[in-house]
Amino acid sequence: MARAKFERSKPHINIGTIGHVDHGKTTLTAAISAVLASIDNTVKLKKFDEIDAAPEEKARGITINTSHVEYQTPLRHYAHVDCPGHADYVKNMITGAAQMDGAILVVSAADGPMPQTREHILLAKQVGVPSIVVFLNKADMIDDEELLELVELEVRELLSKYDFPGEEVPFVAGSALLALEACLKNPTIGKGKDKWVDKIFELMDMVDKYFPTPERDIDKTFLMAVEDVFSITGRGTVATGRIERGAIKVGETVEIVGLKSTASTTVTGLEMFQKTLDEGLAGDNVGVLLRGVQKQDIERGMVLAKPGSITPHDKFEAEVYVLNKEEGGRHTPFFPGYRPQFYVRTTDVTGNISQFTTDDGGSAEMVLPGDRIKMTVELIHPVAIEQGMRFAIREGGRTVGAGIVSKILD
């Protein structure tokens, strides 16, 4: 059977559900797919147990259970990620296995914000999730309107505390379970027949309006991490790699950044699959011929970038998830002064971890396998790093942690 072609008629957005365990994230994910399927036969209804039985995936050497559900509103196409366990959320957000352009925070109206509600908001901030909308679930269990308002106020304060615009974040109160049940009874229910189903439509209207369309990788400034270098007699030096973002044309100037002092050069040729190209775009694996560059001047781990767009750094703060021993991580804790390898884009660089900071701003003496922690790192060579960049921590060739740069310090 021929594969269905992916139609690009609408803007595509990646979103996900976050929030405390048992507040209804997976039920809401199922309800959204069911409600949208009721007005659009191209949307496939996903049942709760299909989403809950999340397949294992590997991202940066870490196994994560995530479910991907696809659906569309009249305005946009969405890929929605839902993780069954709390640890899977932490790992997913730190490795960026499934990027989120926006998150739906699910809070049970019956319980109010709980510890993981707080932790997921903090994580969303630190890994750079740009916007949040809130779904107050299980609203059918609350008879008192004032109680709902109190929970909303509490969540708004929590969002403001972690630098989200708590005052303006959209809130919808509803019941994911009752909406899902109504759709299972009447799969073409549509709008206006059930108040709980209408609440899900209202939520998706908010998501459509409030989450901005992300800038496409191709519209960003050019960057390519160098994977390999070789020289072609009589023509010069070629750097190969995958273009991470932006576009590059023959004749343009690029900077070679990281490991050594930054140098500037001109692109004299581009090749892909042994064919010459006029322009390389985000996602392409290309060979870039560079004018006047010797093979020894450039190595794996450096990046080619638009001049002035990225600078080398060696000191940063990062949010890190440390693998436990079942995940193939360390069996023992580590302490300040630990010097593992930091795998940044295409290369390992040794770094010294000088201090650990807990969520409440205090300092930790040591870090155990399975912990999530903020740490300060100093690399022995400066490399091209920027806020929001992901990396792996390795020791003897195996991954012992995954992190994201939360702040540049030098």
UniProtKB/Swiss-Prot annotation:
Predominant localisation class: plastid
What Gene Ontology cellular component terms go with this record? chloroplast; cytosol
Q: Which Gene3D superfamilies match?
A: P-loop containing nucleotide triphosphate hydrolases, Translation factors
Q: Name one GO molecular function term.
A: translation elongation factor activity
List where in the cell it is found: Plastid, Chloroplast
Provide an example Pfam family for this protein: GTP_EFTU
tr-type G domain ranges (all copies): 10-215
Q: Which domain of life is it from?
A: Eukaryota
| G5: region residues | 175-177
EC nos: 3.6.5.3
Q: Which InterPro entries match?
A: EF-Tu_GTP-bd, EF-Tu_GTPase, EFTu-like_2, EFTU_2, G_TR_CS, P-loop_NTPase, Small_GTP-bd, T_Tr_GTP-bd_dom
Residues binding Mg(2+) = 26
Keywords (alphabetical) are: Chloroplast, Elongation factor, GTP-binding, Hydrolase, Magnesium, Metal-binding, Nucleotide-binding, Plastid, Protein biosynthesis
Residues bound to GTP: 19-26, 82-86, 137-140
Tell me the segments the record calls region G4. 137-140
* Catalysis: reaction(s): GTP + H2O = GDP + phosphate + H(+)
Family per similarity comment: Belongs to the TRAFAC class translation factor GTPase superfamily. Classic translation factor GTPase family. EF-Tu/EF-1A subfamily.
- PANTHER family in UniProt: ELONGATION FACTOR TU, MITOCHONDRIAL, ELONGATION FACTOR TU-RELATED
Its biological purpose is as follows: GTP hydrolase that promotes the GTP-dependent binding of aminoacyl-tRNA to the A-site of ribosomes during protein biosynthesis.
Q: What is this protein called?
A: Elongation factor Tu, chloroplastic
Q: Its gene?
A: tufA
